[in-house]
Amino acid sequence: MNALLSIAFVLSWSSGFIGAKLGAGSASAVTILMWRFLPLAVILVVVAAVLGRASWRGLTGRDLARQAVIGTLSQSGYLLTVYYAIQLGVSSGTTALIDGVQPLVAGALAGPLLRQYVSRRQWLGLFLGVSGVVIVTMADATAATGVAAWAYLVPFLGMLSLVAATFLESRSRTPVPPSVALTVHCGTSAVLFTAFALSTGAAAPPAEAGFWAAIGWLVVLSTFGGYGLYWMILRRSGVTKVNTLMFLMAPVTAVWGAFMFGEPFGAQTAIGLVVGLVAVVIVHRGGGASRTRAIRRRPKTGGSPQQVAHTLPACPAPKPPDSGHRLSGGCP
């Protein structure tokens, strides 16, 4: 099951780059994002009101506000920077490379922020993953001409936004059903992108059929599949493992682009894909066992600190949502 979820996640997340390219020729980034999330948010709110009321019980305003912040970081901030970078002329390969740094950043911060143990095998896999992404995208990045240097900082900011959302979710103590999280995230993104589009005069959608085909692509594959599976795998396997799968996005996108758009796919891309696969295997095999570590904790009643044996799981283990409302196909 974990392997199938991982494969579905990689394909769904990679589809976002393909969908962005499909829509880039017909509308601006903010127009695409507004019409991607506005109808989706309406549908999700209606479904939640009719079928998913039980999933919302017990959640406080603070819980929902936290999810709104997570949605702002993981959807609005991340996607706007990716789409805007492509609009500025940064290639999809270079954007994927910068996004590929995310697992290394998240893995490095998992220890001090979440007190999670990252093994040497996992670090090896993380560095191999970076190498694989670099191999795939290096030629494309060096060949780019006419792109301002500051434009390459845009997807980097998006990567940091997604890292921040990942850690904010991992530190949440209240379990939020994926269906609820998806609704809040998409609703937040719809409000932000609509406000942005209206304020910049970019709200009117083009009449081209290709635009609406791209919107449908992004809603079904990238939104329901990509983000939903991201949070689902995060809760099942932890920060290090879920982010290591991000290393496969650039190679998979390169293969997909070769078949769909006729983009070149040579030996360098094939080598990078193999290295990325090896990295994922190393990390997933190296993190199977949890490590028991003694941490010092001061009792509330005072007195000297005491040593408490504490098993560090791969990720905080929230209670699973009610099975009747569990998101089976993914989310944004």
Residue ranges and their predicted role:
Residues 12, 16-17, 45-99, 135, ...:
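Specific transmembrane alpha-helical segments of multi-pass solute transporters/efflux pumps
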Residues 44, 109, 118-140, 159, ...:
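Hydrophobic transmembrane alpha-helices of multi-pass small-molecule transport proteins
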Residues 1-34, 40-42, 81, 144-171, ...:
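Glycine-/small-residue-enriched transmembrane alpha-helix faces in small-molecule transporters
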Residues 25-77, 103-110, 160-168, 182-201, ...:
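Transmembrane alpha-helices of multi-pass small-molecule transport proteins
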Residues 6, 62-69, 118-131, 152, ...:
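Cytoplasmic-side transmembrane-helix entry/capping segments in multi-pass membrane proteins
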Residues 58, 96-99, 115-135, 145-152, ...:
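Loop-to-transmembrane alpha-helix entry segments
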Residues 36-38, 138-139, 210-213, 247-332:
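C-terminal-most transmembrane helix of multi-pass membrane proteins
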Residues 33-35, 79, 94-101, 167-191, ...:
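Helix-helix packing/entry segments at the starts of transmembrane helices
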